[in-house]
Regions:
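Short beta-strand segments
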Residues: 5, 34-37, 62-63, 171-174, ...
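Mid-to-C-terminal alpha-helical segments outside catalytic/metal-binding sites
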Residues: 1-9, 15-32, 194, 198-205, ...
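Glycine- and other small-residue-rich loops at beta-strand/loop junctions that grip anionic moieties
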Residues: 36, 113-114, 215
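Conserved protein kinase catalytic core
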Residues: 11-13, 146-147, 177, 215
Length: 253
């Protein structure tokens, strides 16, 4: 089974250089990864360099300035960046508030969307998914659910209803994002199970959240625990969750 990590941060001004990520990937037999630009950084050149230095191992999602009307998006796309990070309620600070969403749709980019449940259920995101039904949007961090939800998980269930939109997928993070430490987790809410039931395995993709995951369960455990937790699933379903979904969406071969 090929394993793809769909949520990694790396850089030279914040976090760690790519060699640190590659060490963890190689140690854990992770084949490929998606470099998600970190908040506040609009120079995506380092990610382009990473893709050029290690061909076939990485895809990347850019961030552009709030006032960009699409021109910078086009420039980075021409350099091989296949995705863009746009918060679910994002609006550009230019003549066309939807310019960045519109450009992403025109270029067939993948949107990696940081979010909260309220943002996903709000009017701004609803407008986007209605206007751009063919734009693939990958919901980050299990919908931003965090450690807060309590049964019966009404807000999270409302988020999962978005699975009826075929252009949406969802990232499954390390369980330390929604399970109390320490590791191994003993109190596991059924959120991951619910997400897989709603989106089906072919629209769920694992992402470690490296390097912030290092302050939770750590990189290796962020993969080890869900792999063990979902051992009851078929080999095909697990292949989708831990690699094939990401390869399909992020154009990794």
């Amino acid at each position: 089974m090929k394993i793809v990590d769909t949520h990694c941060h790396t850089g030279i001004h914040k976090y760690e250089p790519v060699e640190s990520l590659l060490y963890h990937m190689d140690t854990c037999d992770v084949n490929q990864a998606v470099l998600i630009q970190h908040a506040g950084e609009t120079d995506n050149a380092y990610h382009v360099q990473c893709m050029e230095r290690f061909p076939g191992r990485f895809a990347a999602a850019m961030i552009v300035a709030p006032e960009d009307d699409g021109r910078q998006i086009r420039c980075w796309a021409e350099r091989g960046v296949v995705g863009i990070r746009l918060p679910a309620n994002s609006r550009a600070q230019c003549a066309d508030p939807l310019a960045q969403w519109r450009t992403a749709a025109e270029l067939n980019l993948i949107v990696s969307a940081p979010c909260t449940p309220s943002a996903l259920l709000g009017e701004a995101f609803t407008e986007v998914i209605n206007l751009f039904p063919d734009l693939h949007i990958c919901i980050e961090h299990l919908g931003g659910v965090g450690l807060e939800p309590q049964a019966p998980y009404e807000a999270f269930r409302a988020v999962l209803a978005l699975a009826e939109r075929e252009n949406l997928s969802i990232k499954l993070p390390g369980f330390g994002e929604f399970c109390p430490l320490p590791y191994p987790f003993s109190d596991v809410a059924p959120l991951a199970d619910m997400a897989i039931e709603a989106f089906r395995p072919n629209r769920v993709m694992w992402g470690s959240d490296y390097p912030p995951v290092s302050s939770r369960e750590g990189y290796a455990h962020s993969l080890e625990f869900p792999m063990q937790y979902f051992s009851k699933l078929s080999e095909e379903d697990r292949a989708w969750i831990f690699g094939r979904s990401a390869q399909t969406v992020w154009q990794l071969t």
